[in-house]
Amino acid sequence: MFNKIIKLGQKKFNKSDQHHQDNNNNNNNTSTNTVVRGSRTTTPAPSSVSNGESQTTAQSPSQTPNHPMFTTTPILEVLPLLKDVSSSDRPLLFMKKAHMCSCHCDFSDTLIMPREKEIKRQTLLELVDFLHSSSGKVNETMQSELIRMVSANIFRCLPPAYHENTGAPPEGNDPEEEEPYLEPWWPHLQLVYELLLRYVVSSEIEPKTAKKFINHTFVSRLLDLFDSEDPREREYLKTVLHRIYGKFIFHRPFIRCSIYNIFYKFLYETERCIGIGELLEILGSVINGFTVPMREEHRLYLVKAILPLHKSKGISIYHQQLAYCVTQFVEKDYKLADTVIRGLLKFWPLTNCQKEVLFLGELEEVLDATEPSEFQQCVVPLFTQIGKCLNSAHFQVAERALFLWNNEHIVGLIAQNKDVIFPIIFEALERNMKGHWNQAVHGLSENVRRMFLEMDTELFEECEKQYLENEAKACELLEQRELTWKRLEEAASLAAN
């Protein structure tokens, strides 16, 4: 029965192939299998067609199996269900279905190709269920055709962001606030990603066999897709890549290195934040699995690739994931606390108050995991910066800095180094008490000042005495300066007369 179906299918294939070959000859100068509306850096699949193509067929990927059914252009047609054929016929039918799903449907208009779209959707759903079922045995040839179909669907040129077009964006337009571009053919693309995910996590798939298809090239092109503006696609990519990292141990160094290279490219070339948050989320789980003592390679990437991410203007998009990664490093190896804190101070924002609030929140998380021995190494530059934050005219910055004293672990570290810290921030607290415009900041400063007084009265009095002496000297210097200017003005008036 199945052989009859195959023969009938071949006849249809031959007729259709001749028809489409004639069309291809007539339109040879105008056809293309890449997206033409401006592409980004993602490498297109050699056999994929544009998302906006209105044809019902697509060129099949190269290196197709040497079977008669795969020598023709795939056509979307109804095939028997996998569960309705014998186990011996199932592999060939599976490959035919996978080959058929290499076609791309036109989603630019909902009225175009409704039947073909539904056939492909139902076929993809069946393949997903087949891999998920206990009977879903997939041999090496089937895996090859499956990954070829996945590649033909997901690897494509991505449309450029609005601000990347040659025309200048409207005045005041912020690329970070643009509405993301949503893939119109997501109903199919989602199922392809689900199929890939089922393949990767399947216990029936041996890594030694799958590495022939999930190789460095495949992983590299998968990483390129993190530049997609569609958040749904990036979420699937994050899950798939994380599963690949967990299952394919021999790919782990390559994946880590590739992620760091994307960070380098973002920092020094594109400054495009899309996908950085998802990559950092993957990296956070990776760091959590590092062994202690940490290898020098990981320390180097922390300094060269992760900490510099703090200097980006678009840090608010991925700061939560970045802070988690940084904190994970300190929790894994407490000796990295000094490196991390000095890195934060190096990239501390000077004019962006909202970014400064983010830094203070991250600093608290890092200090919460810092040991006293590491804290002592950076206490002076750290509290010099905190003192500046205490006196910030932006009340949110000043408040966030004062909230550090609500953390018991940080208060304990301060108490152990009070001889160094008190003189640094005492002046900042006094200035807030006397002249800060925000009442909440005024009250918080008073609470911290009282805490210092209770912690060490004698040291507090010494700092207060030193502060009053410095204020007196400053007043005296100001009077001398005013007197000097007055004398210069008088001398200038006499000379003019």
From Swiss-Prot:
Pfam families named in the record: B56
Compartmental location: Cytoplasm
Keywords per UniProt: Cytoplasm
Single GO molecular function: protein phosphatase regulator activity
InterPro entries named in the record: ARM-like, ARM-type_fold, PP2A_B56
Coiled coil stretches, renumbered: none
Subunit structure: PP2A consists of a common heteromeric enzyme, composed of a catalytic subunit (subunits C), a constant regulatory subunit (subunit A), and a variety of regulatory subunits such as subunits B (the R2/B/PR55/B55, R3/B''/PR72/PR130/PR59 and R5/B'/B56 families).
Homology family: Belongs to the phosphatase 2A regulatory subunit B56 family.
Domain of life: Eukaryota
Protein name, UniProt field: Serine/threonine protein phosphatase 2A 57 kDa regulatory subunit B' epsilon isoform
Source organism: Arabidopsis thaliana (Mouse-ear cress)
Compositional bias segments (type: Low complexity): 23-34
GO biological process entries: signal transduction
Function: The B regulatory subunit may modulate substrate selectivity and catalytic activity, and may also direct the localization of the catalytic enzyme to a particular subcellular compartment.
Location, primary (coarse class): cytoplasm
Tissue expression as described in the entry: Expressed ubiquitously.
Signal peptide: none
Chain residue ranges for the region called Disordered: 12-71
GO cellular component: cytoplasm; protein phosphatase type 2A complex
Compositionally biased region (Polar residues): 35-71
Gene name tied to this protein: B'EPSILON
